[in-house]
Swiss-Prot record:
GO terms for biological process: cilium assembly; endosome organization; intracellular protein transport; osteoclast differentiation; protein localization to centrosome; protein localization to cilium; vesicle organization. Residues 8-125 are annotated as: Required for interaction with ATP6V1D. It comes from Bos taurus (Bovine). It comes from the Eukaryota. Residues 156-167 have a biased composition (Basic and acidic residues). Signal peptide: none annotated. This is Sorting nexin-10. SUPFAM superfamilies: PX domain. PANTHER family: PX DOMAIN-CONTAINING PROTEIN, SORTING NEXIN-10.
Length: 200
């Protein structure tokens, strides 16, 4: 194998482990674990896991579209009025659709430069806090928010972060996307992040 092939950038994303969460006595929802493993300099953390619900994905798509009007964003799985969170097939179809959405988003260099995407994938912040952080209205930066979440929720041993993609085995439900970045898209940590500017 040639040395340059070993250094090729990759981003792998998994959407897995759907869980029913109680919102209140009458209402429940499903959230999903999003796991990232990458060697891309665009990411603050090389490995991360965070839980998000469907309507947060809807917010993310709207946010990305508003910041990249000329980009045709991939579609999310449709909101099914007859969706049954106790129906395993319904839940898995949505999980797969959410994973496909993220995989396609991460293949687009312009979308990958959006700080909102990184906070969605690698922090605990809700949509309002993400918007505040990206617009500079918080005491913490994007990177600080991600690092704080990583310290609170470390899921991978430190020695694992330097390993190759195939050293991590989640399950059979996985997707990965590879892409390269020119030096024009690089900053101090490899990607020029955008900090420019509901749920259903």
């Amino acid at each position: 194998m040639f040395p340059e092939q070993q250094k090729e950038e990759f981003v792998s994303v998994w959407v897995r482990d759907p869980r029913i969460q109680k919102e209140d006595f009458w209402h429940s929802y499903i959230d999903y674990e999003i796991c990232i493993h990458t060697n891309s300099m665009c990411f603050t953390m090389k490995t991360s896991c965070v839980r998000r619900r469907y309507r947060e994905f809807v917010w993310l798509r709207q946010r990305l579209q508003s910041n990249a009007l000329l980009v045709q964003l991939p579609e999310l799985p449709s909101k099914n009025l007859f969706f049954n969170m106790n129906n395993r097939q319904h839940v898995d179809q949505r999980r797969q659709g959410l994973e496909d959405f993220l995989r396609k988003v991460l293949q687009n260099a312009l979308l990958l430069s959006d700080s909102s995407l990184h906070l969605f994938l690698q922090s605990h912040l809700n949509s309002e806090d993400i918007e505040a952080c990206v617009s500079g209205q918080t005491k913490y930066s994007v990177e600080e928010a991600i690092h704080k979440f990583a310290l609170m929720n470390r899921r991978f041993p430190e020695e694992e972060e330097g390993k190759k993609e195939n050293d991590i085995d989640y399950d059979s439900e996985s997707s990965s996307s590879g892409f390269g970045h020119s030096s024009d898209d690089s900053s101090s940590h490899g990607c020029k992040m955008s900090t420019a500017p509901q749920e259903s």
